């Protein structure tokens, strides 16, 4: 794969304006000579020669920062409303929807790189990262150079680029697509969040395949209702290209809703149960689990009259579904089924996704997982309960993030109390909230169940490791791959994996 290139060459303003079509009203400036050096919606990121897009955000209105952007060197501004007084020395583009304009301008600035890639999008509450990373591994192992964009990072070959958001803003997203194309990628696999769909971050992208993993309560502080949340997720399937197909988890109650606007011949369905009504038999992929350990599962997969064995290097029935959907994407794209299964079984471990950490004598196992919703916590605990020896204990350390959906806190407390033998409540990115107040709300769902409450996450993990006996399994949930603890706007370095490794190293 070629060397990764950072940045992009300049673009003629006239060419960018053309990408907006007739909807943009243009005033002022000298577009004939203007060369744009960058596109951004963040006035703090403006550099001389940039085009600033004034987006009305959830917290702040970009129109209030137009002056700051011009002072920083912006030579053009796209906005929905002109300032009361404005200078003709700057080119003004008045647009009906600044979010869509940001996506269109960014795509044009980076040379329509996304059109040169086979795009595969994965959406759902849980399982996006695992499924997307599995698809990426499968494509690369099958000879299709693929980049990945998702939770925490963008990966192009062996090069990792940190990301703040699961699905970045359009200017960042199209920069990443450009880097992928320049590095020789033929495909991009990306997690597509509900926020990104509603906020038009993926506007103008057309997907060869789109995957729905599941839908459970999450982000209701943003979407307000499950119906709105489901509708947001379904928007992804409206962006399939002419050859595009959907892969739907038929076991999810919203499966039929997700597929409702698609022609039957564009839908593949996956099931580990008895759900057979969603798809034509030739388009059904079914898995039956035959063996499970903390190291992973084995399953028999049937599809289109064929039956094959599938090795899943992650524990839990839900990870069988994640791999089944990744496999279905491969078959849908024309990859040889045996090749697809071999590459999936050999996929690299995913940080913070059922990541196993063992004591030196391998008698005790800790599992780090990103489970931070009620459904994810329940599935993780159920998966580990199924592989915990009858004479051993299952323990969990977890908390709930601050400044996020408060409704889930007592529910997660209830789930932990019901499914684990030992529970330790602790902090998980309290952000601007009082950590003890968050734990009070989690505790409210535990119905008096005996547990420990240790707000210091490192101390909570240390105590949990001390309590482990031979054969016991400890789930440390909520943060997964994250290497920080966010407190009052400051991200302090902290890694569950590093903390566990240190605790096991000290164990006699």
UniProtKB/Swiss-Prot annotation:
It holds the Pfam family Mur_ligase_C. GO terms for biological process: cell division; cell wall organization; peptidoglycan biosynthetic process; regulation of cell shape. Transmembrane segments: none annotated. GO terms for cellular component: cytoplasm. It is found in: Cytoplasm. InterPro entries: Folylpolyglutamate_synth_CS (IPR018109), Mur-like_cat_sf (IPR036565), Mur_ligase_C (IPR004101), Mur_ligase_C_dom_sf (IPR036615), Mur_ligase_cen (IPR013221), Mur_ligase_N (IPR000713), MurE/MurF_N (IPR035911), UDP-N-AcMur-Glu-dNH2Pim_ligase (IPR005761). The modification N6-carboxylysine is found at residue 233. SUPFAM superfamilies: MurD-like peptide ligases, catalytic domain (SSF53623), MurD-like peptide ligases, peptide-binding domain (SSF53244), MurE/MurF N-terminal domain (SSF63418). One of its GO terms (molecular function) is tetrahydrofolylpolyglutamate synthase activity. Keywords: ATP-binding, Cell cycle, Cell division, Cell shape, Cell wall biogenesis/degradation, Cytoplasm, Ligase, Magnesium, Nucleotide-binding, Peptidoglycan synthesis. It is an enzyme of class 6 (ligase). ATP binds at residues 124-130. The keyword Acetylation does not apply. Pathway: Cell wall biogenesis; peptidoglycan biosynthesis. Belongs to the MurCDEF family. MurE subfamily. This is UDP-N-acetylmuramoyl-L-alanyl-D-glutamate--2,6-diaminopimelate ligase. It comes from Chlorobaculum tepidum (strain ATCC 49652 / DSM 12025 / NBRC 103806 / TLS) (Chlorobium tepidum).
